[in-house]
């Protein structure tokens, strides 16, 4: 199984630690943005082409995953559109933290709504058996 972690850029160290835990469970992380993140996100200094390349790489990483793990309480911005994209395209979404109104509505009324959990530990416990299959 492949999994993409959605979180605020500033939480890249936490995401890298989650990547290690995923690998130990036999789950391949695809969120390469976190492996490369260093310091604060500085989009203002990027050209339009650079922004597009980053966005395109992240989208391809997300599209290659069968599960997206959303760290909703990390004050992310782009992550909400990534989560919506995952739900639209049939990627299973595991939502850690407080859900948004839209995520809750998708969970109740949508065919591919997120699975809500309180902590990363809860998410990994639920996903653990799936990685070895």
For the regions a protein language model found, what residue spans apply to each?
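Conserved catalytic or regulatory cores that recognize and/or transform ribose-phosphate-containing ligands
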Residues: 1-133
């Amino acid at each position: 199984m492949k999994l993409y972690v959605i979180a605020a850029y500033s939480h890249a160290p936490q995401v890298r630690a989650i990547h290690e835990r995923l690998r130990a469970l036999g789950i391949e992380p695809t969120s390469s943005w976190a492996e490369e993140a260093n310091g604060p996100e500085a989009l203002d200094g990027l050209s339009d082409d650079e922004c597009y390349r980053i966005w395109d790489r992240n989208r391809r990483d997300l599209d290659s995953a069968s599960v997206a793990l959303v760290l909703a309480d990390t004050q992310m911005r782009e992550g909400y559109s990534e989560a919506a994209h995952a739900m639209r395209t049939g990627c299973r979404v595991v939502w850690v933290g407080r859900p948004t109104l839209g995520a809750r509505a998708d969970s109740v009324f949508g065919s591919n709504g997120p699975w809500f959990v309180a902590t990363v530990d809860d998410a990994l416990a639920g996903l653990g058996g799936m990685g070895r299959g």
